[in-house]
C-alpha cells in the first residue's frame, strides 16, 4: 500500500516555553480537526508565524506511530539491572553468599600495616627525660604501699593518704572523689539513656562507698582547656604487688611531668578505687566530672559519713594539707586517656604489653592512639606488643589448610607479577584469623574490655595497656629496669598527645585488628557484610513477583504452575514468565508493575504475621525486667521462667491480635509461604542494616546465622512429598539451621567449641544475657527484636501447611 503522503515530514521543534507534554497535546488536538481538502495544512496566520510546519496526519495513523514510539522506549539501566538480578535471584544469591563468606575469610590477607596519620603526634621524636631519680621515688612509693599490707587496721585510709601525700609532695593539686556503687539491674529505658543519667540510691550505707584520689598538674604552657588523663586502678582495701607496681610507674611519670617546661595540656592522675570494680570507679568519676551537681547532696553525704570526708587530715605535713582540696577539681577537655596496669601473669621470654581497646557496643578509639603506643613500645622500649586472640582458632585444622591455600595462591600470583603482594604465610594467617575473630567477638559482645570503656561514652579516646614482666618475682635491679622502660613508654605517649593541636580525627574509628601492627578498615570489611546480605532483597522481590504471578494466573483461570516448577528451588524465581521481565520488553512496564502492586494484597496478611511476631520479640526482650524482681532466683530458674513466659506471651498475643499462623483469607493462595518468606527476608534485611550502623560486628555475626536460615527456609511438607535427594538434603539443612539458629543453642554450641562442653549449664545463657543488659549492649536488643522473630518466622515457614 502506497503511503498517503509523499512529502517529507518536517522537523518538529518545540515552541519556546512549551513542554514536550504540552506540545504533544497541541499536536493531538490538531489531528482531531475536520478533514481539509488540501493534503497538507499549515498555520500561516500572523499570530502563528513562529509555529513549525506540522503536516496533517489521520488520527489512526498517528495512533499507530505513537504506539510504535512507546514500544521502542526501554526502562532505565538501573531498572533493567534490578529486573535481571531478580529474575536470576537463585544464581546471584548463591554467588553473593559464597562471596560474602570468602571475603570474610580473606580479611586477614587484605589487612594493611598500621601507620600514624596525625603528623603532630611525632612519637619518639624527643629523647625521654625519665631518669633513675624518678625510678627511685617510685620504688619508695612501692615499698610504703607494700608495708601497709602488714597493718590491717587503717590500711584502707592509709593507702589513700599515702598516695595523696606523694602527689602533693610532687606539687600537684590533690582532691578526693567519693562515690557509691550503682546497682546493676535490668531496666528497658537504660538502653536509651545517656551515660550521665544517674540514680540516687536510697539508704546508702557508709560501708558501701569508694574514694578515688585525683591529682592534677596545671600545664605551664597551657590555658587549662585541655587535659590528658592517666588512670591506675588499685584496691584500697588490699594493695597487691602488681597494683603497687602500676602506681609506681604512674607516679614516676607524674612526678616528672610536674617539672618539665614543655607541657601544654593539664595532666590528671586518677587513682581509681577498684574495690567495687575498675569500671565503676572510673565511670563514677567521669560522670561527676562532666555533669556537676549543684545541690546539697555533698553536705548530706558529709554528715552521713564524716570519716570518709576527712581523708586528707595529714597533720604531719602542712604542705600536703595546704595542697589538698575538699571540692571536686577539674581540668580542661580530655584529649585522651591511658589506663596503666601491671598484669598478673608473667611472660616466659620477654617483657610484653597487651592493648585493650574495645568499648561499649563495639566502639573503638582512634587508631592513631593504638599506633602511637605500639610504635613507642616496639621501637623505643623493646616491648613485645600483643592483642587478644581466640586461642581455639590456633588449633583448627581447616584454618591451617585455608592458610596454606592462600599462601600458595600468593606464591603463584608473585610468580606471574612480582609486584603483587597477595598472600601471607600460613602461620601469620592463623594468628591474624584468631586476632580478627577476637576483635569481632569483643566488639559484637558490646561489653568494654577494661575501664577505658567509660571514656568512650564521653567521646574520649582511651585504651588500657597491661604491662607484663618477664618474670613474676622482680629483683631490685630487674624492678628498676622494668619501671624505667614502662615509665618512658608512658612518658612518650604523654609527649605525643601533648603535641596534638586538636582531638584525634585523622585516622580510623571503625576498624578490626589482625595484629598490633595490622588492621582492616571499614571500607574493606563492609564488603563482606554487603555481599552476605545482598541476596535477601533480591530473593524477597523474586518470591513476591512469582507468588503474585501465580495468583494472577489462578484468578484468570490459567493453568497453575506445575509441581516441578514449584519444587525446583527454595528460592522461587521467574525469568521467562515474570511480569517484570515481560514488562521490560514492552511499553507496559509501569502499567504491569502497578497491576502487580494493586492486585496482590496478599502480602498484607504476611505483614500482619511478621508484625505480630516482631511485637512478641519486643515483649520477650522486656520480660527479664520482671524476672529480676523475683528474689533468690538462680540463673537456671530465671532462664526456665523466661522461656515459659515467652511461650505464654505468644499465646496471649495469639488471642488478642489473632494468630500469626492462621490462614485468614489466603486459603486460595498456593504461594502464601513464599509471600511470608519475602516479608521475613525484607524485615531481616532491614534489621541487619540498622544493626550494622550501631555495631557492625553484631550485624556480621548475626548475618552469618540469619541469612542462610532465611534463604534456605522451605516448607518441609513439600520436600517430604517430593522425596528426592535434593529436597531431602534441603530439609535436613533447614532442620540443622533451625536448631543452631535458636539463640540458646547458638550460645551453647559456640561456648562449647571455644571452651569445651564439660562446664556448660542451662543457666549460662541467662548469665551471658544478663551481662549484656547490665552493660546496655545493643546486642541484647538485636537478639530479642531482630534475630529471635526472624528465627520464629523461618520455623513457621518450615512447618507451613501448604
Regions found by a protein language model. Name each.
Residues 1-59:
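Intrinsically disordered, low-complexity basic segments at termini and long loops, enriched
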Residues 60-115, 521-802:
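Alpha-helical transmembrane segments of integral membrane proteins
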Residues 442, 466-550, 788-801:
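His/Asp/Glu-rich mid-to-C-terminal helical/loop segments that flank catalytic regions of hydrolases
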Residues 314-320, 450, 517-519, 552-557:
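Short secondary-structure transition/capping segments
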Residues 9-10, 21, 163, 167, ...:
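Generic low-polarity alpha-helical segments
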Residues 10-12, 37-41, 47-50, 66-68, ...:
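Low-complexity, intrinsically disordered Ser/Thr/Pro- and acidic-rich segments
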Residues 114-509:
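Soluble extramembrane regions of membrane proteins in the secretory/endomembrane system
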Amino acid at each position: 500500500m502506497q503511503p498517503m503522503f509523499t512529502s517529507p515530514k518536517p522537523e518538529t521543534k518545540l515552541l519556546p516555553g512549551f513542554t514536550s507534554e504540552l506540545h504533544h497535546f497541541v499536536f493531538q488536538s490538531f489531528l482531531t480537526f475536520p478533514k481539509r481538502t488540501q493534503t497538507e495544512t499549515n498555520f500561516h496566520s500572523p499570530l502563528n508565524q513562529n509555529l513549525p510546519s506540522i503536516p496533517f496526519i489521520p488520527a489512526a495513523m498517528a495512533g499507530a506511530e505513537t504506539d510504535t514510539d512507546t514500544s521502542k522506549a526501554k526502562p532505565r539501566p538501573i531498572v533493567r539491572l534490578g529486573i535481571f538480578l531478580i529474575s536470576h535471584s537463585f544464581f546471584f544469591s548463591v554467588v553473593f553468599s559464597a562471596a560474602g563468606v570468602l571475603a570474610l575469610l580473606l580479611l586477614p590477607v587484605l589487612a594493611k600495616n598500621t601507620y600514624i596519620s596525625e603528623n603532630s603526634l611525632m612519637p619518639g621524636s624527643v629523647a625521654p627525660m625519665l631518669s633513675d631519680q624518678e625510678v627511685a621515688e617510685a620504688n619508695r612509693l612501692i615499698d610504703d604501699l607494700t608495708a601497709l599490707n602488714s597493718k590491717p587496721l587503717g590500711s584502707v585510709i592509709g593507702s589513700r593518704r599515702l598516695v595523696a601525700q606523694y602527689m602533693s609532695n610532687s606539687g600537684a593539686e590533690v582532691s578526693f572523689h567519693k562515690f557509691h556503687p550503682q546497682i546493676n539491674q535490668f531496666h528497658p529505658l537504660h538502653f536509651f539513656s545517656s551515660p550521665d543519667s544517674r540514680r540516687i540510691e536510697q539508704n546508702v550505707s557508709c560501708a558501701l562507698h569508694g574514694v578515688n584520689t585525683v591529682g592534677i598538674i596545671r600545664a605551664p604552657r597551657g590555658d587549662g582547656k585541655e587535659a590528658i588523663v592517666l588512670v591506675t586502678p588499685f584496691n584500697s582495701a588490699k594493695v597487691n604487688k602488681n597494683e603497687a607496681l602500676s602506681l609506681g610507674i604512674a607516679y614516676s611519670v607524674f612526678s616528672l611531668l610536674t617539672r618539665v617546661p614543655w607541657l601544654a595540656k593539664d595532666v590528671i592522675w586518677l587513682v581509681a578505687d577498684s574495690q567495687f570494680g575498675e569500671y565503676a570507679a572510673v565511670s563514677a568519676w567521669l560522670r561527676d566530672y562532666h555533669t556537676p551537681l549543684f545541690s546539697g547532696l555533698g553536705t548530706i553525704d558529709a554528715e552521713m559519713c564524716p570519716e570518709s570526708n576527712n581523708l586528707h587530715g595529714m597533720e604531719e605535713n602542712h604542705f600536703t594539707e595546704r595542697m589538698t582540696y575538699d571540692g571536686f577539681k577539674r581540668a580542661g577537655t580530655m584529649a585522651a586517656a591511658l589506663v596503666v596496669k601491671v598484669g598478673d601473669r608473667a611472660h616466659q621470654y620477654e617483657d610484653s604489653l597487651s592493648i585493650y581497646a574495645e568499648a561499649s557496643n563495639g566502639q573503638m578509639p582512634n587508631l592513631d592512639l593504638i599506633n602511637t603506643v605500639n610504635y613507642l613500645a616496639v621501637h623505643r622500649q623493646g616491648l613485645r606488643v600483643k592483642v587478644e586472640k581466640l586461642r581455639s582458632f590456633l588449633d583448627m585444622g581447616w584454618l591451617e589448610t585455608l592458610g596454606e591455600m592462600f599462601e600458595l595462591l600468593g606464591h603463584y600470583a608473585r610468580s606471574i607479577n612480582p609486584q603483587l603482594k597477595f598472600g601471607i604465610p600460613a602461620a601469620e594467617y592463623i594468628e591474624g584469623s584468631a586476632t580478627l575473630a577476637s576483635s569481632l567477638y569483643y566488639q559484637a559482645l558490646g561489653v568494654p574490655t577494661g575501664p577505658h570503656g567509660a571514656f568512650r561514652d564521653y567521646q574520649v579516646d582511651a585504651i588500657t595497656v597491661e604491662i607484663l614482666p618477664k618474670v613474676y618475682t622482680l629483683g631490685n635491679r630487674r624492678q628498676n629496669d622494668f619501671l624505667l622502660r614502662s615509665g618512658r613508654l608512658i612518658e612518650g605517649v604523654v609527649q605525643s598527645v601533648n603535641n596534638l593541636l586538636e582531638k584525634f580525627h585523622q585516622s580510623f574509628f571503625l576498624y578490626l585488628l589482625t595484629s598490633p601492627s595490622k588492621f582492616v578498615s571499614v571500607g574493606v570489611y563492609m564488603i563482606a557484610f554487603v555481599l552476605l546480605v545482598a541476596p535477601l532483597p533480591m530473593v524477597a522481590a523474586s518470591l513476591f513477583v512469582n507468588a503474585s504471578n501465580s495468583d494472577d494466573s489462578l484468578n484468570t483461570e490459567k493453568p497453575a504452575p506445575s509441581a516441578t516448577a514449584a519444587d525446583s528451588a527454595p528460592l522461587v524465581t521467574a525469568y521467562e514468565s515474570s511480569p517484570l521481565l515481560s514488562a521490560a520488553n514492552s511499553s507496559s512496564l509501569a502499567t504491569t508493575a502497578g497491576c502487580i502492586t494493586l492486585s496482590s494484597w496478599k502480602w498484607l496478611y504476611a505483614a500482619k504475621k511478621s508484625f505480630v511476631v516482631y511485637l512478641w520479640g519486643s515483649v520477650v526482650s522486656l520480660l527479664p525486667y520482671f524476672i529480676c524482681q523475683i528474689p533468690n532466683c538462680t540463673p537456671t530458674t530465671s532462664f526456665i521462667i523466661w522461656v515459659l513466659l515467652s511461650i505464654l506471651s505468644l499465646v496471649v498475643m495469639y488471642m488478642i491480635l489473632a494468630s500469626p499462623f492462621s490462614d485468614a483469607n489466603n486459603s486460595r493462595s498456593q504461594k502464601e509461604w513464599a509471600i511470608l518468606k519475602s516479608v521475613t527476608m525484607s524485615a531481616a534485611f532491614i534489621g541487619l542494616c540498622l544493626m550494622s550502623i550501631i555495631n557492625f560486628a553484631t550485624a556480621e555475626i548475626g548475618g552469618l546465622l540469619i541469612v542462610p536460615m532465611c534463604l534456605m527456609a522451605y516448607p518441609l511438607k513439600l520436600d517430604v512429598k517430593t522425596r528426592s535427594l535434593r529436597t531431602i538434603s534441603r530439609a535436613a539443612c533447614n532442620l540443622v539451621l533451625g536448631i543452631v539458629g535458636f539463640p540458646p543453642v547458638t550460645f551453647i554450641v559456640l561456648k562449647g567449641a571455644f571452651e569445651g562442653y564439660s562446664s556448660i549449664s542451662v543457666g549460662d545463657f541467662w548469665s551471658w544475657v544478663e551481662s549484656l543488659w547490665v552493660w546496655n549492649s545493643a546486642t541484647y536488643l538485636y537478639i530479642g527484636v531482630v534475630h529471635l522473630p526472624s528465627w520464629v518466622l523461618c520455623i513457621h515457614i518450615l512447618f507451613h501447611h501448604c
